[in-house]
Amino acid sequence: MAETFNFELVSPERLLVSETVTEVVIPATEGEMTVMANHAPTMTTVRPGVVAVKTAAGNTERYAVFGGFADILPTGCTLLAESAVHVDELDSTVLENRIEAARAELEGASDEKKTRLEQLVAELTKLGEIVIPA
């Protein structure tokens, strides 16, 4: 049996997850990151994507996150998300509104900000393709 550790997923609105898990896959800015017990201490930024949480009971739950930070320690992991929701609760309208807001912000944005916003639009679009059935 795999070793377990504590995982918390927190958004400004609420605590979404606080439980003992065996594995968490995080959409880190540098790429997908699998966190397991006794992971080396790391702090990373999180891009919009899906967090997969494998519980000690063997179930896997998926959450859509819209950026944030992950604090990883050997005994636990805390993900502070800008916004997060269980994928079953993700509404295509909410996602489309986020994409449209980012596109609207592109108007008149500086080159540096424009690049970040274009990347955000691409990440949100990909997130929609992953979690919302066609």
Curated annotation (Swiss-Prot):
Protein's cellular compartments: Cell inner membrane
Membrane association type: Peripheral membrane protein
InterPro entries: ATP_synth_F1_dsu/esu (IPR001469), ATP_synth_F1_dsu/esu_N (IPR020546), ATPsynth_dsu/esu_N (IPR036771)
GO MF entries: ATP binding; proton-transporting ATP synthase activity, rotational mechanism
Keyword entries, A-Z: ATP synthesis, Cell inner membrane, Cell membrane, CF(1), Hydrogen ion transport, Ion transport, Membrane, Transport
Keyword Ion transport set for record: yes
Chief location of this protein within or outside the cell: membrane
Gene3D superfamilies for the chain: F0F1 ATP synthase delta/epsilon subunit, N-terminal (2.60.15.10)
GO cellular component terms, semicolon-separated: plasma membrane; proton-transporting ATP synthase complex
HAMAP family in UniProt: ATP_synth_epsil_bac (MF_00530)
Physiological role: Produces ATP from ADP in the presence of a proton gradient across the membrane.
Family: Belongs to the ATPase epsilon chain family.
Oligomeric and partner information: F-type ATPases have 2 components, CF(1) - the catalytic core - and CF(0) - the membrane proton channel. CF(1) has five subunits: alpha(3), beta(3), gamma(1), delta(1), epsilon(1). CF(0) has three main subunits: a, b and c.
Name of the protein in question: ATP synthase epsilon chain
Upper lineage: Bacteria, Pseudomonadati, Pseudomonadota, Alphaproteobacteria, Hyphomicrobiales
